[in-house]
């Protein structure tokens, strides 16, 4: 018996030492850097169609984090919807400023950042979405817009605020929240005629709804979104503009706790104008005001196919599940 107890004590001691060592390593290393990605890419041609699509995508996917509402420039600010356990996290200046922004970045360097989360300096932007499933054409549209003659993208001499990650975010960036690799081949988008496939593309590739509407940022799977814990079942914790906790909505088709009783028109109202069947949808839920009828239809069609999850959330007066 004494021998067994000694062995247990020894194992526990080793576990404590290992944990202390890991914490010390993470604290010292911080968020890691990587070799900058080098996508094979010719210069992006800024066609009128790409500039229009790029503006739509930037407004939908980038502006909430990077747009300074007072100046109208993509100069960045603190992400107030990130919960304190991640520390203080800031969106960078992505205007065309040559010193503080991306004015000297090449198209390929921007694509590398959008796809992997790694900048040309090798710094990993751990909170930045990784648009690994976005089509090459949509990515090119974003890049074209960021280099275009638009007021949002014009040079703004605002220095990006240094990140202040918590120990938890440092640990996560060294373990489960790592960057993704560049796609190994061309990335296309399904056609509008296949509503379910196109709806999935919108949800996981273009607008990345699963990031907030699955169970937890810490367990999301960027490469295989459907493998994220609680895929689209809600429960992820964010903050609103007043700093109060907000739990993301269950958007599976469960009729009791999800949106199974919503019509296509009601989904469109919620997405475009922030008006749900039972009341307004508050921040940090974005308003996708430029969604087309075809996009709303595709999203609705895809959501009907997602496995239903019974998970009540505070939206619509439903108590959150324990």
Where are the model-predicted features located?
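N-terminal type II signal-anchor transmembrane helix
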Residues: 1-34
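Alpha-helical membrane-targeting segments
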Residues: 21-24, 28, 157-186, 314, ...
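C-terminal capping alpha-helices of c-type cytochrome domains
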Residues: 23, 106-119, 130-156, 263-277, ...
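Electrostatic cytochrome c docking/interface patches
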Residues: 31-59, 73, 174-204
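Gly/Gly-Pro-rich "capping" loops immediately C-terminal to redox-active cysteine motifs
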Residues: 44-45, 55, 70-107, 124-135, ...
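The canonical Cys-X-X-Cys-His
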Residues: 54, 61-69, 142, 199-202, ...
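C-type cytochrome heme-c attachment and multiheme electron-transfer modules
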Residues: 118, 176-192, 197, 245-276, ...
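Extended amphipathic alpha-helical interaction segments
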Residues: 166, 186-188, 201, 211, ...
């Amino acid at each position: 018996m004494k021998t067994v107890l000694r062995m247990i004590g020894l194992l526990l001691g080793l576990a404590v030492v290992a944990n202390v060592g890991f914490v010390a390593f993470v604290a010292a290393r911080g968020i890691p850097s990587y070799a900058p990605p080098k996508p094979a890419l010719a210069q992006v041609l800024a066609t009128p169609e790409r500039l229009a699509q790029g503006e739509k995508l930037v407004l939908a996917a980038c502006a909430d984090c990077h747009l300074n509402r007072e100046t109208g420039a993509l100069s960045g600010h603190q992400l107030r919807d990130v919960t304190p356990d991640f520390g203080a996290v800031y969106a960078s200046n992505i205007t065309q400023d040559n010193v503080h922004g991306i004015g000297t970045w090449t198209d390929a360097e921007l694509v590398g950042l959008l796809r992997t989360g790694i900048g040309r300096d090798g710094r990993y932007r751990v909170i930045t979405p990784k648009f690994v499933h976005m089509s090459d054409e949509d990515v090119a549209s974003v890049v074209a817009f960021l280099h275009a003659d638009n007021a949002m993208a014009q040079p703004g001499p605002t220095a990006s605020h240094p990140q202040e990650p918590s120990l938890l975010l440092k640990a996560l960036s060294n373990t489960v929240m790592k960057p993704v690799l560049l796609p190994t081949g061309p990335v296309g988008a399904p056609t509008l005629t296949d509503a379910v496939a196109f709806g999935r593309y919108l949800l996981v590739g273009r607008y990345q709804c699963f990031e907030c509407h699955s169970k937890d940022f810490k367990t999301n799977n960027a490469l295989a979104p459907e493998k994220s814990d609680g895929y689209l079942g809600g429960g992820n914790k964010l903050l609103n503009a007043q700093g109060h906790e907000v739990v993301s909505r269950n958007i599976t088709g469960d009729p009791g706790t999800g949106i199974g009783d919503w019509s296509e028109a009601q989904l469109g109202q919620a997405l475009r104008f922030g008006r749900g069947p039972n009341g307004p949808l508050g921040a940090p839920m974005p308003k996708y005001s430029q969604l087309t009828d075809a996009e709303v239809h595709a999203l609705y069609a895809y959501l009907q196919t997602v496995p239903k999850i019974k998970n009540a959330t505070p939206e619509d007066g439903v108590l959150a599940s324990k």
